[in-house]
C-alpha cells in the first residue's frame, strides 16, 4: 500500500520550512560577527542594548561559551548551529552554553537598562 502526502499537509510543511529558512537568513544578515583580539579568549562590546542586538560566532563541538553582562534579567539567548536555544545562567551575570555541535551560533542580547557592556568568552 502506497502512502501519499495530501496537498494541505504538504503545503503546510513547505510553509513552515520557508518561515524557518527566512528567519535564520534574516538573523544571519543582521548579526555582528564576534571577533576576539589576538591571543584572547574574550571580546567585549558596549552600547545601547534597549533594542535586541544579535551576534554570531563559529564554535567547535564541546566548547564552553559564556556571555557576561550585568542586569540582563533573561535578556541573553543563544541559538546553536541547529537553531536550538541552549544555555543556562551560572550566576547573576553569566550565561553559559556547552556546545553540542560545531557551527555558527547566534547570541541575542537585550537589556531594559539600555547602555551596557557585554563580554563574550569561548574556551
Where are these regions (language model features)?
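Acidic, Ser/Thr/Pro-rich low-complexity intrinsically disordered segments
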Residues: 49-112
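Structured catalytic/translocation cores of nucleotide/phosphate-coupled proteins
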Residues: 14-16, 67
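Bacterial N-terminal signal peptides that target proteins for export
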Residues: 2-13
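Edge beta-strands of jelly-roll/beta-sandwich modules across compartments, strongly enriched
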Residues: 55, 112-123
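C-terminal segment of classical bacterial N-terminal signal peptides
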Residues: 16-25
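Non-catalytic extracellular/lumenal accessory regions of secreted precursors
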Residues: 24-63
Amino acid at each position: 500500500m502506497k502512502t501519499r502526502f495530501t496537498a494541505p499537509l504538504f503545503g503546510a510543511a513547505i510553509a513552515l520550512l520557508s518561515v524557518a529558512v527566512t528567519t535564520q537568513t534574516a538573523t544571519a544578515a543582521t548579526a555582528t560577527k564576534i571577533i576576539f583580539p589576538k591571543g584572547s579568549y574574550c571580546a567585549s562590546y558596549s552600547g545601547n542594548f534597549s533594542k535586541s542586538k544579535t551576534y554570531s560566532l563559529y564554535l567547535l563541538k564541546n566548547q564552553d561559551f559564556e556571555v557576561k553582562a550585568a542586569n540582563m534579567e533573561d535578556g541573553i539567548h543563544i541559538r546553536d548551529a541547529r537553531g536550538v536555544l541552549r544555555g543556562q545562567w551560572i550566576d547573576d551575570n553569566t550565561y553559559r552554553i556547552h556546545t553540542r555541535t560545531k557551527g555558527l551560533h547566534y547570541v541575542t542580547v537585550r537589556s531594559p537598562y539600555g547602555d551596557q557592556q557585554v563580554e563574550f568568552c569561548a574556551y
